[in-house]
Regions:
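Conserved N-terminal structural module of periplasmic/extracytoplasmic solute-binding proteins
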Residues: 1-51, 58, 254, 354, ...
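Conserved C-terminal helix/tail region of periplasmic/extracytoplasmic solute-binding proteins
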Residues: 132, 311-317, 330-386
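Hinge/lid segment of periplasmic solute-binding proteins
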Residues: 46-103, 122-124, 149, 247-248
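Extracytoplasmic/periplasmic solute-binding protein
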Residues: 84-88, 93, 120-177, 222
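Extracytoplasmic/periplasmic substrate-recognition and gating elements
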Residues: 6, 103, 108, 198, ...
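Glycine-centered hinge/linker elements that transmit conformational signals in sensory
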Residues: 123-125, 166-206
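Short helices/loops that flank or line small-molecule/ion binding pockets
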Residues: 27-39, 56, 101-102, 122-132, ...
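Short helix-initiation/N-cap motifs at beta->coil->alpha
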Residues: 20-29, 48, 116-121, 203-218
Length: 386
């Protein structure tokens, strides 16, 4: 994005400074910026960050922008007839796989469609181990991977529609549902237990190194890695041309609601235009940059070729450039994506990420995990789902 800002600046004569944050939720930095009165003209965060800013009256309505009709209204954040976010890309997550390594180890052809259930996955893991791949899968230890990407599958896979997941988290918040009683929770965490059993980092799971996981998948030392298409950024450093990679749904025994066929995925990294700390001239420049990304060949190439993103806009004809992105793009084109929940509290991934780390590290059992998740949601006050 820094390169994109520089390229756009060279064309327009304007200056767009890109500020990045380290680890942790964007909500902390965004809140600090507003408290200091120096929020930037463009804010990229998680969807809950945009929702919070909209509630505070900080975001500009973007429905008048030309890109709105080409995907903005479909993938952006809409509220009360207004559009408040620019969808930078579509992202999907699940089990990343190295088909080349799997087939080499098995000595036969393999297709992800044959591995749908947890039982199928267990059988495949055992076959890979027998073929010499001692630990076929890698799990990350980061809180965002565990809570924002795996745990959230439980909410998102309650049904096909956004409202199914939104209503479920509200049921958790009002106490009418307990997560440990939920069939999807049981199914996904049966699989998570299996992933832990065959985890390449199982000797010290909380010391797992993200870059090492990427290298291991790219080089065929492991067959699977729970992650998303963004993992290509690290994988590409070790990737050998001709290696077949892709993303498949997390196999599980509960097949209801297309759980064995659909990927978790939605618009990611939404961008809003601030109206509280930025004047009309700054807002106009911000809008021009977004228009450049969505509506010019150069901007499109930044998204697809330089950033390896999956564009959310129908007018962009550039195709995904790697196997991970192609898997997600195909699922999106076929309508096989579970929509992402909008109303997560800003501390969801950090708080429940710590809980998930305890579970991954063997410090708590499944019952204790469920109780901590229930206790977290019991503290949340969510507006009724309209």
């Amino acid at each position: 994005m820094e390169a994109a800002a520089k390229e756009w600046g060279g064309l327009t004569g304007a200056t767009l400074n890109v500020y990045t944050i380290g680890s942790g939720a964007p909500s902390t930095e965004i809140s600090a910026r507003y408290a200091a009165g120096n929020a930037p003209a463009l804010i990229m965060g998680d969807i809950q960050d945009i929702v919070t800013c909209v509630k505070s009256g900080y975001a500009r309505d973007l429905k008048d922008q030309s890109w709105a009709k080409n995907g903005g209204l479909t993938y952006g954040y809409n509220k009360d007839g207004n559009l408040y976010s620019f969808p930078l890309c579509i992202e999907g997550r699940g089990l990343l796989y190295n088909k080349t390594a799997i087939e080499k180890t098995l000595g036969r052809d393999w297709d992800p469609s044959e591995t749908k259930s947890m039982d199928d996955l267990k059988k495949l893991f055992d076959e890979l181990v027998k073929g010499g791949m001692e630990t076929p899968v890698a799990l990350n230890q980061e809180d965002w991977s565990l809570a924002a990407h795996y745990l959230t599958l439980v909410y998102e896979e309650q049904g096909e529609k956004l409202e199914d997941g939104e209503k479920y988290i509200r049921a958790l918040a009002d106490g009418s549902e307990k997560i440990e009683d939920n069939a999807r929770f049981k199914s996904l965490f049966d699989t998570f237990d299996l992933l832990m059993q065959y985890n390449s980092n199982r000797e010290d799971p909380l010391a797992a190194d993200y870059a090492s996981n990427a290298a291991d998948l790219a080089e065929g030392d492991i067959a699977f890695w729970f992650n998303g298409n963004w993992g290509w950024a690290e994988i590409s450093e070790y990737y050998e041309d001709g290696t077949e990679l892709g993303i498949m749904p997390v196999p599980q025994n509960d097949a209801d609601n297309h759980a064995q066929e659909w990927l978790a995925g939605s618009a990611s990294k939404p961008i809003m235009v601030d109206i509280k700390n930025n004047d009309e001239k700054q807002q106009a420049a911000a809008l021009d940059f977004l228009d450049w990304l969505a509506n010019t060949k150069e901007g499109n190439q930044v998204l697809v070729e330089k950033c390896s993103l999956i564009p959310a806009f129908s007018n962009i004809k550039e195709q995904a450039t790697n196997g991970l992105a192609k898997s997600v793009q195909q699922a999106a084109n076929e309508g096989r994506l579970f929509p992402g929940i909008i109303d997560y509290p800003g501390d969801h991934w950090s708080t429940l990420g710590a809980t998930m780390q305890k579970y991954l590290g063997g410090k708590i059992d499944r019952a204790e995990l469920g109780k901590e998740i229930d206790a977290y949601w019991a503290k949340q006050k969510l507006e009724p789902w309209n």
